[in-house]
Curated annotation (Swiss-Prot):
It holds the Pfam family Ribosomal_S6. Gene3D superfamilies: 3.30.70.60. The gene is rpsF. Disulfide bonds: none annotated. One of its GO terms (molecular function) is structural constituent of ribosome. GO terms for biological process: translation. The keyword Signal does not apply. This is Small ribosomal subunit protein bS6.
């Protein structure tokens, strides 16, 4: 039995975009994939980082990672929209084989597991 591959799309937004607009971009691209028939597994904003080299006269960019399932048709739809957007300065989609990534745990969202008590010996 073969596992269905999943895809990871990393895209970089212009650094001068307001925070509200960044959130709308995250929602926009996730919704495009869902409408095209993909299952979105994870949508992570990696934050503003310095670029290795200038892209379109920008030295920084806002990195976003999007993991999704699908038959591959959705990738073309997503990349077409990103190509036409002035806010996306670079994007890359990679097909991943193998098991799906473990769900990410956001720090502070779950209480810490209790630590097992160790017996202290006194001599």
């Amino acid at each position: 039995m073969t596992q269905q591959p999943y895809y990871e799309t990393m895209y970089i937004l212009r650094p001068d975009i307001p925070e509200e607009e960044v959130e709308s971009h995250l929602t926009k691209y996730r919704d495009i994939l869902v409408e095209a028939g993909a299952d979105v597994l994870d949508n992570q904003m990696r934050g503003k980082r310095r670029l290795a080299y200038p892209i379109a006269k920008h030295k920084e960019g806002i990195y976003v990672q999007l993991s999704h399932n699908g038959d591959g048709q959705q990738v073309a739809v997503l990349e077409k929209v990103m190509r036409l957007s002035e806010d996306v300065i670079r994007y890359l989609t990679v097909k991943q084989e193998g098991p799906l990534p473990a769900p990410r745990v956001v720090p502070g969202s779950e209480p810490a597991a209790p630590q097992p008590e160790t017996a202290e010996t006194s001599a």
